[in-house]
Amino acid sequence: MQSNIENVSRDYAKILQSADLEKEINPLCTNIEDMLARLDEFETLLASVRAESNGMMANNVCSILGFTDSFEQLKARIDGLEQCVGVVSANLSEVERSVDIAEEELHVTDYSLKGLLLKPLKAKLSASDTSTLSSLPRSNLVEEEYQPVEIYKSDDYFGKSEEENYVAK
């Protein structure tokens, strides 16, 4: 048993003597040095980005704060536009309702050119009967006169433009 241990120890000694540790460790050291150099470059780049970002933030925040009045005006204009869009939507609904009533009064169901021109004329000729007129549920006429739908005025929401003021003078 003692001889086996000595044989094994000699074999291991030969392996250790034949192994060139410097040859195996040098590539690892080189890789570690490369990684440290890259890490240093990254740290420098990160510091540069931080400094630039801080400078930009300081300059831009001051500029943005300088536009506060303009932002308030823009906000007021956007609010006016939203109100205008709401009123336009309501006006459009009223105009559509008025058109529907007019189509009912003229008995228009055919939207071709022929239908739009001839059908109302035929309906007027055949509608001389008063019972037909009394059966119509709604009308755009007040005292036999057409009443147009009142629509919005953009000046109410945006004011007159400088161009319109110049033309008015």
Curated annotation (Swiss-Prot):
Domain of life: Eukaryota
Residue stretches spanning the membrane: none
InterPro entries (UniProt xref): Cappuccino
GO cellular component, one term: BLOC-1 complex
GO biological process: eye pigment granule organization
General function of this protein: Component of the biogenesis of lysosome-related organelles complex-1 (BLOC-1) involved in pigment granule biogenesis.
Subunit structure: Component of the biogenesis of lysosome-related organelles complex-1 (BLOC-1) composed of Blos1, Blos2, Blos3, Blos4, Dysb, Muted, Pldn and Snapin. Interacts with Pldn.
Family: Belongs to the BLOC1S4 family.
Protein name: Biogenesis of lysosome-related organelles complex 1 subunit 4
Organism: Drosophila melanogaster (Fruit fly)
Record gene name: Blos4
